[in-house]
């Protein structure tokens, strides 16, 4: 199998490789090329995990949320309203809530898409079954 047919099978991009130019201390221009990665190659490398970001966000969001609770509690236990630590705690708290909410939203959208795909495939099966028995 040739290299070109392998690239076509993996979905390699058709455009030329990107080129970056840098100047080194001797005032010479160094040209560095880097490969482009297509979505197919990314899915092959990650095993399709790029579509499950909501599962990765949840643990990080929980840690940030708990840290925000602790920092805010410590700040307000010393009556330091408006200090840097209380603002930092509130920022962590709100960031954790935002990450949890976005993760829940992504999960709901993903579930809805799965339901639509199931319904479409079931409709196709019923139509095929009717054609067979008609």
From Swiss-Prot:
Keywords: Cell membrane, Cytoplasm, Developmental protein, Differentiation, Endoplasmic reticulum, Membrane, Phosphoprotein, Transmembrane, Transmembrane helix. Expressed in dorsal root ganglia. Expressed in neurons as well as nerve fiber bundles connecting ganglia and fibers innervating muscle layer of the gastric body, jejunum, and proximal colon. Expressed in arterial endothelial cells and neurons of the central nervous system and peripheral nervous system (at protein level). Expressed strongly in lung, weakly in brain, heart and muscle. Expressed in enteric neurons and vascular tissue in the muscularis propria of the gastrointestinal tract. This is Transmembrane protein 100. It is a multi-pass membrane protein. The keyword Chaperone does not apply. Its main location: membrane. InterPro entries: TMEM100. The gene is Tmem100. Disulfide bonds: none annotated. It comes from the Eukaryota. Interacts (via C-terminus) with TRPA1 and TRPV1. Interacts with TASOR. Signal peptide: none annotated. One of its GO terms (biological process) is positive regulation of vasculogenesis. The chain crosses the membrane at residues 56-76, 84-104.
């Amino acid at each position: 199998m040739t290299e070109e047919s392998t690239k076509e099978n993996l979905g390699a991009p058709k455009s030329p490789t990107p080129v970056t130019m840098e100047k080194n201390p001797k005032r010479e221009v160094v040209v560095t090329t880097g490969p482009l990665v297509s979505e197919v190659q990314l899915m092959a490398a990650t095993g399709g995990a790029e579509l499950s970001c909501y599962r990765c966000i949840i643990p990080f969001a929980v840690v940030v949320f708990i840290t925000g609770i602790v920092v805010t509690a410590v700040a307000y236990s010393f009556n330091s309203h408006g200090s840097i630590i209380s603002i930092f705690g509130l920022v962590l708290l709100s960031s954790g809530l935002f990450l949890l909410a976005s993760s829940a939203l992504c999960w709901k959208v993903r579930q809805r898409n799965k339901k639509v795909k199931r319904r479409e495939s079931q409709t196709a099966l019923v139509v095929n079954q009717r054609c067979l028995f008609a």
